[in-house]
């Protein structure tokens, strides 16, 4: 499922990163290409079929204003991007065990992201959460054609 969204801070708040710190974090993600004008492309050839997200980072007064993202991705990539935007380094805290997502979410999972950011769905013109977007994405894009029952991440409780 392709997405076209913008990640914004919650009203009255700021995203915790500077343009430069986000550029550094995104530059460390395999397959991510970040340009100094704020544009980025993330291609994951390990996903089947290959997924690609294109985006643009907008900043104002030394802080991130919002990030626009378009393309196709899986839920793990979406979480990785949201975590970077919100200042959380390292891999996502979700781990798969025996084909099922573990029930616990670490403090830097969606619960922490949603205390910092909200998501604007551009085409639909409404606001939602990062976890709601993730619930609409496959765990791996190859699961779009898979008979596996696990094709989506569960929403945190």
Region locations from a protein language model:
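Acidic (Asp/Glu-rich) sequence patches and key acidic residues
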Residues: 1-157
